[in-house]
Amino acid sequence: MEKMVLRKVVLLAILLSLSCLWVAKALEGESKVSGQVRDETPHTWYCKYDDNCRENCPGCTITKCNYGVCICSNCYHQQSDLGVESHM
């Protein structure tokens, strides 16, 4: 009986340690994503159609040619693109 309880405790400890490792790995992934800077200011270029805006706004999730002007927003840039030094 004691061996069965001991096995269950060991199994529970292993599962708990694996879940902690999984959480730590997930948090590490979030820290890599936070290395990107989100640009909230819209950028504008002249355009004739939406494809021009996609070419001029790399990394932007919203691109639209509106009355001949590209509207680019929700843009993500690597910190190195913005002139910020990275010490990784």
UniProtKB/Swiss-Prot annotation:
Coiled coil: none annotated. Belongs to the DEFL family. Residues 1-26 form the signal peptide. This is Putative defensin-like protein 264. Disulfide bonds join 47-65, 53-70, 57-72. Keywords: Antimicrobial, Disulfide bond, Fungicide, Plant defense, Secreted, Signal. It is found in: Secreted.
